[in-house]
């Protein structure tokens, strides 16, 4: 298998505007063949989604979901570029899927950028203490910590969570697929989850 170098990742990123991790995965899946990686990204809709990511999303809708027992409710603001897309049944279905994800998985934040710095620092401190208690040395801790933080982010941030119906993709992947399908940018603006007896 050919090596995936940073130069290859950079070139693929420049040619497709896809994210660095998406480019790396595309190259790994295609034996470092850049042309096949571009095709792979296009098939996945990632290249298309990345190109549309900068566009403003001024239209949209608020989608709601009440869990069967009536004890959990979710509201999601899902935005699109045009009202044509936001009025589409598939757009509403996407919103429902995201609502059910929130009801089931209870994310605390939308994305990594929305985690308050103090909260992230607190988690890092807890993780460091746990690793020290396990007898890990300082240099080992610094190597282990990024992986633990990534796992934490994938648990508490909606867009990083594995999709509850198909854990081979994240909510971010689900949105990118919708962007490719609709041909315009779609964003999750915010969400709120209510639970009887919860805060």
Curated annotation (Swiss-Prot):
Cited Pfam families: EF_TS
GO biological process: translational elongation
Keyword Cell inner membrane included in the entry's annotation: no
GO molecular function: translation elongation factor activity
Region of interest (Involved in Mg(2+) ion dislocation from EF-Tu), residue spans: 82-85
Protein localization: Cytoplasm
UniProt keyword terms in alphabetical order: Cytoplasm, Elongation factor, Protein biosynthesis
GO cellular component, one term: cytoplasm
InterPro entries xref list: EF-Ts_dimer_sf (IPR036402), Transl_elong_EFTs/EF1B (IPR001816), Transl_elong_EFTs/EF1B_dimer (IPR014039), Transl_elong_Ts_CS (IPR018101), UBA-like_sf (IPR009060)
Protein role: Associates with the EF-Tu.GDP complex and induces the exchange of GDP to GTP. It remains bound to the aminoacyl-tRNA.EF-Tu.GTP complex up to the GTP hydrolysis stage on the ribosome.
Similarity-based family: Belongs to the EF-Ts family.
Record-linked PANTHER family: ELONGATION FACTOR TS (PTHR11741), ELONGATION FACTOR TS, MITOCHONDRIAL (PTHR11741:SF0)
UniProt-listed HAMAP family: EF_Ts
Protein name per the record: Elongation factor Ts
